[in-house]
Amino acid sequence: MGQLISFFQEIPVFLQEALNIALVAVSLIAVIKGIINLYKSGLFQFIFFLLLAGRSCSDGTFKIGLHTEFQSVTLTMQRLLANHSNELPSLCMLNNSFYYMKGGVNTFLIRVSDISVLMKEHDVSIYEPEDLGNCLNKSDSSWAIHWFSNALGHDWLMDPPMLCRNKTKKEGSNIQFNISKADDVRVYGKKIRNGMRHLFRGFHDPCEEGKKCYLTINQCGDPSSFDYCGMDHLSKCQFDHVNTLHFLVRSKTHLNFERSLKAFFSWSLTDSSGKDMPGGYCLEEWMLIAAKMKCFGNTAVAKCNQNHDSEFCDMLRLFDYNKNAIKTLNDESKKEINLLSQTVNALISDNLLMKNKIKELMSIPYCNYTKFWYVNHTLTGQHTLPRCWLIRNGSYLNTSEFRNDWILESDHLISEMLSKEYAERQGKTPITLVDICFWSTVFFTASLFLHLVGIPTHRHLKGEACPLPHKLDSFGGCRCGKYPRLRKPTIWHKRH
């Protein structure tokens, strides 16, 4: 752990070296390419298949492709069609004979028959929507009838007026449309009957050619509609939201001051009584569709301190001794200093001179401490430790006579330079970075092998589409048991 922390702390330092940058680049490329190869090999998909097999059969979502899936949405009208004041009207039909419209707190019975209960001479004619106030006691009933009339296609300016019973009479409310297939109302009757077909799917037209036919609307609760508005009738009539949507579309030109339909699937931000509520009144309740909503400084003296088997080092020791002696005897006279120096030099050099004299007598090359040779590296300026140029028979040796010596020194110089460079690089390149580069390369090689081989990810029914997310067994059935075993041949498939 400490090595890893040190590695991250030294990132700004070792990135100054080109080699380190290369190692980092190689590591990143190897890791990224390795992950891509693993993904393309199908290993991840195969593991997901084993982990998730049989666990997604009940979610109702079928995956068709990589980014496409089969889904569904349920249209709910519960809040929209609730029986509250000023809610939208909703429609239902019972046995193709009785039609009902629920508007606010009121329910209306709609029938088509050949019986006329109203007469123009004795009842109220409705020429415009305001006249509905003479027929119905409650304003919420008036706007519902007004809306329904518009949905049927009634034109208040051009079409014949409707008839209604005056609200002061005890018999109850009644509104009548003449939709006969005769006389001068033939075209108007056809338009109203077509409106009924749009509002109520499966509407049966009982009108006969050449005979009278009327569409009547009664408010449930009045004496004239009591027999058909009981709970036994209304409980059997299931309000159909599709019919209601047809009703909304056909009534799109009708404006209601208490709630206005702004768009097909949205409402204005008001409360249930129509008062403005800036910021919304639980908007989800008013929607038709609600959703479940990253050199080492090696001087000649330093080398001689490590190795003293060189004539040059002997001479350096002599010079160094003399220098120290002069510092020690600084207050003595010059004569005494010279005498001491000569004495010391004689004591130190007697042994060397004796050895050289013996070598001279035996014709063996020796050093007279006057000339030295060394090997120099012309590019870097580094050189070897100077060595004495030997003498034999009074003359210096030819370079060819000690060729092996200077070739060996050259090899030592090169080795020393390489060792120095290696040590420098070792100091600047963390071992952790080298390890990362090595193992990332191994990871890339292994992933490349898996990518070339390929791993199957899931079963298919032979010759059919991808079954995801349903995981098939060898018999072609879903592992979770939602679908039976088809006993069709299956094949392992790579990707989908």
From Swiss-Prot:
The chain crosses the membrane at residues 18-32, 34-53, 436-456. Gene3D superfamilies: 6.10.140.1590, Arenavirus glycoprotein, zinc binding domain. GO terms for biological process: fusion of virus membrane with host endosome membrane; receptor-mediated endocytosis of virus by host cell; virion attachment to host cell. A lipid is attached at G2 (N-myristoyl glycine). Zn(2+) 2 binds at H458, H460, C466, H496. Disulfide bonds join C92-C237, C135-C164, C207-C213, C282-C295, C304-C313, C367-C388. GO terms for molecular function: metal ion binding. Residues 2-17, 54-58, 59-435 are extracellular. The record marks K33 as: Important for GP-C-mediated membrane fusion. The record marks S58, D59, K262, A263 as: Cleavage. Glycans are attached at N83, N95, N137, N166, N178, N368, N376, N393, N398. Keywords: Disulfide bond, Fusion of virus membrane with host endosomal membrane, Fusion of virus membrane with host membrane, Glycoprotein, Host cell membrane, Host endoplasmic reticulum, Host Golgi apparatus, Host membrane, Host-virus interaction, Lipoprotein, Membrane, Metal-binding, Myristate, Transmembrane, Transmembrane helix, Viral attachment to host cell, Viral envelope protein, Viral penetration into host cytoplasm, Virion, Virus endocytosis by host, Virus entry into host cell, Zinc. InterPro entries: Arena_glycoprot, Arena_glycoprot_zinc-bd. The keyword Transmembrane applies. Stable signal peptide (SSP): cleaved and functions as a signal peptide. In addition, it is also retained as the third component of the GP complex. The SSP is required for efficient glycoprotein expression, post-translational maturation cleavage of GP1 and GP2, glycoprotein transport to the cell surface plasma membrane, formation of infectious virus particles, and acid pH-dependent glycoprotein-mediated cell fusion. This is Pre-glycoprotein polyprotein GP complex. It comes from Machupo virus (MACV). The lineage of its organism: Viruses, Riboviria, Orthornavirae, Negarnaviricota, Polyploviricotina.
